[in-house]
Amino acid sequence: MAKELRFGDDARQQMLAGVNALADRVKATMGPSGRNVVLERSFGAPTVTKDGVSVAKEIEFENRFKNMGAQMVKEVAAKTSDTAGDGTTTATVLARSIVVEGHKAVAAGMNPMDLKRGIDKAVTAITKELQKMSKPCKDGKAIAQVGTISANSDQAIGSIIAEAMEKVGKEGVITVEDGNGLENELSVVEGMQFDRGYISPYFINNQQNMSAELEHPFILLVDKKIATIRDMLSVLEAVAKSGRPLLIVAEDVEGEALATLVVNNMRGIVKVCAVKAPGFGDRRKAMLQDIAILTNGQVISEEIGTSLETASLESLGTAKRIVVTKENTTIIDGEGKATEINARIAQIRAQMEETSSDYDREKLQERVAKLAGGVAVIKVGAATEIEMKEKKARVEDALHATRAAVEEGIVAGGGVALIRAQKVLDGLKGDNADQDMGINILRRAIESPLRQIVANAGYESSVIVNKVAEHKDNFGFNAATGQYGDMVEMGILDPTKVTRTALQNAASVRSLMLTTECMVADLPKKDEGMAGAGDMGGMGGMGGMGGMGMM
């Protein structure tokens, strides 16, 4: 396919146009006075959002060279979202500022590689200073404040996230779901819950809740399908004699085995419920082992030389209570040994450190939380579907921000932390004048988040930036109220991880753009077939269809 080429300054100008066009649309969402952006959907209601990365992902330009510049900044926003979960608009605004200032320097004849080295030195110095300024985020009040700011100053969201973290711990799993009412709701699932329900509705013993509830049950864990009742006859007889109920967790229970269990349950011979094991493949085996450790049981597996025929009551796990619904199984107060559970948690955490997959890390984190004791579910309430989507996105952003705050601490929000970190650049020198220019580019760029927050609130950015820079510590400007003061006391906080990640990712794209000398894109295809489709002469005979009788 034929290609179109652009070189030198022409290429950089096209790329810069894409960066500016994307950033202009994203920057409008920044700060407490940021505006919403409405995104069209191919079906259903449009999406209303203030999330920078959501806006960026929707933007495509017809001009392919312009689009390349926009795509690079999209990557900055997406990487920031993946790493820190928030700060995507900040990253976009910083990236644009660095690229624009860097482009001016390259146009003036400066060496792009030396500019890059100068910017890198400045980013390293600022990052270290941010980490020095960072304060631990330990108490519920600070967590609520971080969540409130990230959720566009919605105190209800900040408070419910802080409450959820308090109940399940800072490493607990917190999920966000659509609610049924107008108010946000928080429910906490005690013990271990996995997303598998009863195999047959005939196991239900609580008709009001449509659930199977087992008090002090035995738990049989099997890593294969159970098709014949003969395999598990000895276990069933032993459980029936004990008079206690039985939960069976297996790859599947089918055919004769399922029919026999249902009949025994309905006749009251043995109170039983069967569910499929959670997960797939190796993850299923790992989760079965988690349940075994939590309930002080053993997984019946041919891989380790155990079989159903030889299983006894000693092989079974136990728990205080189990509730099985159509979709979930919850094991409450498993009778596993604390030392074994803690050892299993440590083992899973070690796997989290080693894995490079975000998906695997998330699944491992869920397993830790389930073993450690609890999952919190935030149900988002809203009047309409459009409001629900927008509110749910804000809750998820706030949740990511609070996790980041717990992980690396907090700094003064509203762009103030970057202004305070600016002082470390005063004594920083490059190896030559071009590197010094790179340091100065970053010095100006890190003012851009505060400038944008102030501009979106309708104030004069230069005056406010100068006044904030003249003061010390946490002194800043509250764009929501139009007042100056201590940002920490006013509850305006940013997670250190979010600010650091936004800066590092924004700076990473500038070297690619500043050192670009050639751009290559496919030539647009001509619509060759459209001209011949005009008369569609062969369709004339369709008129004869009028004589066809209706059936």
Swiss-Prot record:
List, alphabetically, the InterPro entries matched.
Chaperonin_Cpn60_CS, Cpn60/GroEL, Cpn60/GroEL/TCP-1, GroEL-like_apical_dom_sf, GROEL-like_equatorial_sf, TCP-1-like_intermed_sf
Which cell locations does it reside in? Cytoplasm
| UniProt catalytic activity | ATP + H2O + a folded polypeptide = ADP + phosphate + an unfolded polypeptide
Q: Does the keyword ATP-binding apply?
A: yes
Q: Does the keyword Ligase apply?
A: no
Q: Which domain of life is it from?
A: Bacteria
Span of the signal peptide: none
Q: Which GO terms describe its biological process?
A: protein refolding
Pfam families tied to this protein: Cpn60_TCP1
Q: Which PANTHER family match?
A: 60 KDA HEAT SHOCK PROTEIN, MITOCHONDRIAL
Record's family? Answer: Belongs to the chaperonin (HSP60) family.
Name of this chain's protein: Chaperonin GroEL
